[in-house]
């Protein structure tokens, strides 16, 4: 085989491997949804409210199929402070669920809630249930008050709760 042919084959193999690597690395990013604008968030949400996060508990730990990482599932109790949309009133409490995402994922593609914080949020009611979920990964709005606790539990049955509820 001519030396030029050998170099050309080597270059093509290297380029092919690089393209396979590039496509496999960016494929998960291509599947992520675009952020919803304010109008779409309002339209698709069952509830838009200012809430105070009272507690967060770890309800499950499941292995992620792609990363193999053990990821906690959470249940937060939120107290409604103000309502822009929805059938709840100030003082009502509701539950929101979410699952952590693998640490290697770019973005935060999930909304986390931390005890003590007061934040505007957009939620959808889970079908057939009593809990809510974030409408989109960008459903978290303006932070009105920072969290008292920023480390969430990672073992099933553990929970973190604010020390006291401020008086209305």
What label would you give each PLM region?
Residues 14-26:
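Bacterial N-terminal signal peptides
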Residues 26-168:
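Transition segments tied to proteolytic processing and entry into folded domains
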Residues 4-16:
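Bacterial N-terminal signal peptides that target proteins for export
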């Amino acid at each position: 085989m001519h030396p030029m042919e050998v170099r050309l084959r080597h270059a093509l193999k290297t380029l092919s491997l690089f393209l396979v690597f590039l496509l496999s690395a960016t494929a998960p990013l291509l599947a992520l949804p675009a952020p919803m604008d304010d109008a779409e968030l309002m339209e698709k949400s069952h509830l838009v409210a200012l809430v105070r996060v009272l507690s967060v508990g770890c309800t499950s730990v499941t292995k992620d199929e792609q990363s193999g990482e053990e990821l906690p599932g959470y249940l937060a109790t939120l107290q409604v402070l103000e309502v822009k949309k929805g059938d709840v009133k100030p003082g009502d409490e509701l539950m929101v669920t979410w699952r952590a995402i693998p640490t290697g994922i770019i973005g935060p593609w999930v909304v986390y809630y931390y005890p003590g914080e007061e934040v505007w949020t957009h939620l959808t009611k889970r079908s057939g249930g009593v809990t809510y979920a974030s409408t989109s990964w960008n459903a978290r709005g303006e932070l009105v008050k920072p969290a008292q606790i920023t480390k969430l539990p990672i073992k099933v049955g553990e929970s973190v709760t604010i020390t006291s509820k401020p008086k209305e």
